[in-house]
């Protein structure tokens, strides 16, 4: 067992805060319309250029274990904000640093950390309620485009393309982002489907940064029953390996030995594979699998028709241009199904909707109809160089996530203004003691920091701008850092999704509370010895596969 380094009290927290400062200083430069890019060295290929806070945060690991513990805690605030709302990662980082630093000063001065936390929680809950009250639902294409533009660092084309994609497939529709093979940026609607089942093992992930499995031009095997043994599948698996194409398995379940064997072969590179459970339950599951079969020009392997896995040929497998699988969802893009067969299936479902008398059945049939006929909008991002394409693709993905958040919970005045004005009612909150009051004051001060940072990144004095805005009673009155003017932020189209602002604050407060209430820190002692490389097992069997 590795020896441990143990630190206590203010010394431990101070070192953690040093790590927090290092990460926050790297991330904060990206905030606002005049935020700067960060260049990140990659282990292979050209460096990555990004203005995405969470990408910067994820790239940072510090040599000092205690400082690194602080940096990793701060990173978790940015990561959580990205997972829940898709944006607001830099705001979460700036807020968390401010809350943690001020909180630690008061703990060092003798304040009770638990009461400080209670005061902070009271204040955060009050601000969340203010954000909900201030939020305004968005309906028009223009408002959707505004959110996309702001979240992509003022790129109007990105905002307009996202609005167009949402118009094509609906606000709840499936929209994916991929790299184009030319200079253009286009929206293309293709045959596709999304269902709410994710990968059965995280070992199927191919993109560890986004924690998704991406399969290009895969075969798709649809099996009605559970898979617990791969022996009957060996002929078809061998054929897939020889084709050098990936395989997606959709079955009632894949368990035990079958799942373990697929994972081993995926890790050893013998078989590019992912497995997901089939969507739905009972008869509806079978119907949805038949929908997928028609969409991908495959066959549902079902014992009702006397079909057996050992007799399945590669001709029975469906195909698609691309499949993306996250922890919760699977998206099939551009299935190779016959257009006429898909149209016939749509008509069949429509007739079932007309005939059914059950509201529940009707709702489920309409869901199937939407999945089969809605299609998938693909945002194809082009550019002059690989670095430019990747940087722009990151911004498109951020903007798309922020736009979805805006559709879900509405929008508020952007540019840090909503958080700044939400701090004013906090002075009226009732508390039990002075320590809780100090916790509220920590939040009041921290809520100024995102706006200050936006202004300072634009080259102005943040403190002066904050003071001027607090004198103004209009909650939408703010500072347009792009044009360096004081404006009504809503009328100027400078808006943020309410969900993004709310999530950033809640995640920041959660991390800061952990830091100020930490009294002891235990980390592995640094070792200069190189770890020996593990021996790799043989890759016997068919074509590098191990069954």
Curated annotation (Swiss-Prot):
Pfam families: Cpn60_TCP1. The lineage of its organism: Bacteria, Pseudomonadati, Pseudomonadota, Alphaproteobacteria, Rickettsiales. Forms a cylinder of 14 subunits composed of two heptameric rings stacked back-to-back. Interacts with the co-chaperonin GroES. The keyword ATP-binding applies. InterPro entries: Chaperonin_Cpn60_CS, Cpn60/GroEL, Cpn60/GroEL/TCP-1, GroEL-like_apical_dom_sf, GROEL-like_equatorial_sf, TCP-1-like_intermed_sf. It comes from the Bacteria. The keyword Chaperone applies. It is found in: Cytoplasm. PROSITE patterns: CHAPERONINS_CPN60 (PS00296). One of its GO terms (biological process) is protein refolding. Residues 537-547 have a biased composition (Gly residues). Its EC number is 5.6.1.7. Keywords: ATP-binding, Chaperone, Cytoplasm, Isomerase, Nucleotide-binding. Belongs to the chaperonin (HSP60) family. It comes from Rickettsia massiliae (strain Mtu5). This is Chaperonin GroEL. GO terms for molecular function: ATP binding; ATP-dependent protein folding chaperone; isomerase activity; unfolded protein binding.
């Amino acid at each position: 067992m590795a020896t441990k380094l143990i630190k206590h009290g203010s010394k431990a927290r101070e070192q953690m805060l040093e790590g927090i400062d290092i990460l926050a200083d790297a991330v904060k430069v990206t905030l606002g319309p005049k935020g700067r890019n960060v260049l990140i060295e990659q282990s292979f290929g050209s460096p990555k250029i990004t203005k995405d806070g969470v990408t910067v945060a994820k790239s940072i690991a510090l040599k000092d274990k205690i400082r690194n513990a602080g940096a990793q805690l701060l990173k978790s605030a940015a990561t959580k904000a990205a997972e829940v709302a898709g944006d607001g990662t830099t705001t979460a980082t700036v807020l968390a640093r401010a809350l943690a630093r001020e909180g630690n000063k008061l703990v060092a001065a003798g304040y009770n950390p638990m009461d400080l936390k209670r005061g902070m929680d009271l204040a955060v809950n009050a601000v969340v309620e203010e954000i909900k009250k201030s939020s305004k639902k968005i309906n028009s294409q223009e408002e959707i485009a505004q959110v996309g533009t702001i979240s992509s660092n003022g790129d109007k084309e990105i905002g307009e393309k996202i609005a167009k994609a949402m118009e094509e497939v609906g606000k709840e529709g499936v929209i994916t982002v991929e790299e184009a093979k030319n200079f253009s940026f286009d929206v293309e609607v293709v045959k596709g489907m999304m269902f709410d089942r994710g990968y059965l093992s995280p070992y199927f992930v191919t993109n560890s940064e986004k924690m998704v499995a991406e399969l290009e031009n895969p075969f798709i095997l649809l099996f009605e029953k559970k898979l617990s043994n791969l022996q009957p599948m060996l002929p078809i698996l061998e054929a897939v390996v020889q084709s050098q194409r990936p395989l997606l398995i959709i079955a009632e379940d894949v368990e035990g030995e079958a799942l373990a064997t697929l994972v081993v072969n995926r890790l050893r590179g013998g078989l590019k594979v992912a497995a997901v459970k089939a969507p739905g339950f009972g008869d509806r599951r079978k119907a949805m699998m038949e929908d997928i079969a028609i969409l991908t020009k495959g066959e549902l392997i079902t014992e009702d028709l006397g079909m057996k896995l050992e007799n399945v040929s590669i001709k029975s497998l469906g195909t698609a241009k691309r499949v993306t699988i996250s922890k919760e969802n699977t998206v099939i893009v551009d299935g190779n199904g016959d257009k006429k067969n898909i149209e016939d299936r749509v008509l069949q479902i429509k007739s079932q909707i007309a005939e059914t008398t059950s509201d529940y059945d009707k709702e489920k049939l309409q869901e199937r109809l939407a999945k089969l006929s809605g299609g998938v909008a693909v945002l194809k991002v082009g550019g002059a160089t690989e670095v430019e394409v990747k940087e722009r693709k990151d911004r498109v993905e951020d903007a798309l996530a922020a736009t979805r958040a805006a559709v879900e919970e509405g929008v508020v005045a952007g540019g840090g203004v909503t958080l700044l004005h939400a701090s004013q009612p906090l002075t009226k909150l009732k508390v039990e003691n002075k320590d809780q009051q100090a916790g509220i004051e920590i939040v009041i001060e921290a809520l100024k920091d995102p706006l200050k940072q936006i202004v300072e990144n634009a080259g102005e004095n943040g403190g002066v701008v904050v003071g001027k805005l607090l004198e103004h009673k209009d909650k939408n009155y703010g500072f347009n850092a792009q044009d360096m003017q004081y404006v009504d932020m809503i009328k100027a189209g400078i808006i943020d999704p309410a969900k993004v602002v709310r999530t950033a604050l809640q995640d920041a407060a959660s991390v800061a509370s952990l830091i100020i209430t930490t009294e002891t820190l235990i980390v592995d002692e640094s070792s200069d010895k190189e770890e020996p490389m593990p021996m790799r097992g043989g890759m016997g069997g068919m074509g590098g596969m191990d069954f």
